[in-house]
Design a protein with these regions (language model features):
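Acidic/aromatic-lined carbohydrate-recognition and catalytic surfaces
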Residues: 1-95, 99, 111-171
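Noncatalytic carbohydrate-binding groove/subsite architecture in carbohydrate-active enzymes
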Residues: 167-187
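Structural preference for beta-strand elements that scaffold enzyme active sites
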Residues: 104-106, 160-164, 187
Length: 187
């Protein structure tokens, strides 16, 4: 089964509630930031990070009055894996699939569950739109492996299932061991 942990659809009930109710638990399931403003008072993204699709990694939501992170498409808002309640929900969903008899997962975009917690602009060169293609801001970060090991312990331990992670974002061969080492790896 293709398991997508990085994002939901912008039509998912969680995101719809998150947009409409900033005080809801669902709002904290996503990565929201206040805008910066230009001289004319127009909202600007909170960082200069580019998405994998070369536009901003942020989309402004008029209803919420904030930017949400989306490293792929504005139709795919990123989940906030720093939120322990979100992690518990995603782990429960994964367990449910296993309980229904699924014998494995291809984990889509798994390298991107953690973000640079400082949310500072990248210092890499920027493109004509002022955006930096700096995957180090949201790929293969140390917290990712904490999240995945937690999932391994709470969901996968004791189960006979196959997991294959789609890993990108400039993962090195050494980093591959963080994912796949039999004793200490995340899968």
């Amino acid at each position: 089964l293709d398991l997508i942990l990085n994002h939901t659809s912008d039509e998912h009930p969680w995101f719809i509630k998150a947009r409409a109710h900033p005080d809801s638990p669902e709002h904290a399931f996503y990565i929201w930031k206040e805008p910066r403003y230009d001289a004319a008072g127009c909202p600007l993204p909170p960082t200069n990070w580019a998405s994998f699709f070369a536009d901003s990694a942020w989309a402004y939501d008029e209803q919420a009055g904030q930017y949400y992170m989306k490293i792929f498409s504005r139709k795919m808002p990123d989940l906030n894996w720093a939120n322990p309640i979100l992690r518990q929900r995603m782990e429960a969903i994964t367990r449910q699939w296993l309980d229904m008899g699924i014998d494995g997962f291809r984990v889509d975009a798994v390298a991107h569950l953690a973000r640079d917690p400082e949310f500072q602009d990248s210092e890499l060169p920027v493109n004509a739109q002022g955006l930096a293609a700096d995957w180090s801001k949201f790929s293969n970060l140390p917290a990712l492996f904490d999240y995945l090991r937690e999932c391994k312990q709470t969901v996968l331990a004791g189960r006979d299932c196959l997991t294959i992670g789609e890993v990108g974002g400039g993962a090195s061969p050494q980093m591959a061991l963080n994912y796949a080492d039999k004793e200490t790896g995340a899968f």
